[in-house]
């Protein structure tokens, strides 16, 4: 049975692990591919400690991002419903449509928060009325707000 050696991955490697993981691989794979390509480093005690420190720091950063998103969610939902004026034709049908950019702009004007328009899910809006819109602030946090489309 061949000996195995431990390496710390510097980036994600399919079927092996994520950045910062300590994995055991065949010595030839480590010496001939992983280490020369910069994909991994030899797992010494100091390197393992440093990798654990980096992982903990990354975990704390992700937690802080999620808490920031929760704060933004509260601020956005507190001011709901938001009014968007649109030109109206007959039968209360609006000209054009309400886009995610319109929603992002109205949130910026009212809540003073800049939101990425790509994270906003707007239903098809063709009439005046109140509509539910989902604003994704973080992979785990989304705000549900109401948009009131009014005549201009």
From Swiss-Prot:
One cellular component term from this protein's GO annotations in UniProt: ribonucleoprotein complex
Keywords assigned: Ribonucleoprotein, Ribosomal protein, RNA-binding, rRNA-binding
GO biological process, one term: translation
A single GO molecular function term of this UniProt record: rRNA binding
Cystine pairings recorded for this chain: none
Pfam family, one: Ribosomal_L9_C
Role played: Binds to the 23S rRNA.
NCBIfam families per the UniProt record, alphabetical: L9
Family: Belongs to the bacterial ribosomal protein bL9 family.
Identification of the protein by name: Large ribosomal subunit protein bL9
Organism: Microcystis aeruginosa (strain NIES-843 / IAM M-2473)
Gene name of the record: rplI
């Amino acid at each position: 049975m061949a000996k195995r050696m431990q390496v710390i991955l510097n980036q994600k490697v399919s079927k092996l692990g994520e950045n910062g993981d300590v994995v055991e691989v065949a010595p030839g794979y480590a010496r001939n591919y992983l280490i020369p390509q910069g994909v991994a480093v030899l797992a010494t005690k100091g390197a393992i400690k440093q990798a654990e420190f980096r992982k903990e720091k990354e975990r704390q950063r992700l937690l802080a991002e999620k808490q920031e998103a929760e704060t933004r969610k509260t601020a956005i939902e507190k001011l709901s419903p938001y009014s968007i004026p649109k030109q109206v034709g007959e039968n209360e049908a609006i000209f054009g449509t309400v886009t995610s950019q319109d929603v992002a702009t109205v949130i910026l004007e009212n809540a003073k928060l800049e939101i990425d328009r790509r994270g906003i899910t707007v239903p098809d809006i063709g009439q005046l009325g109140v509509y539910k819109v989902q604003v994704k602030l973080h992979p785990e946090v989304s705000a549900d707000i109401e948009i009131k489309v009014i005549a201009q």
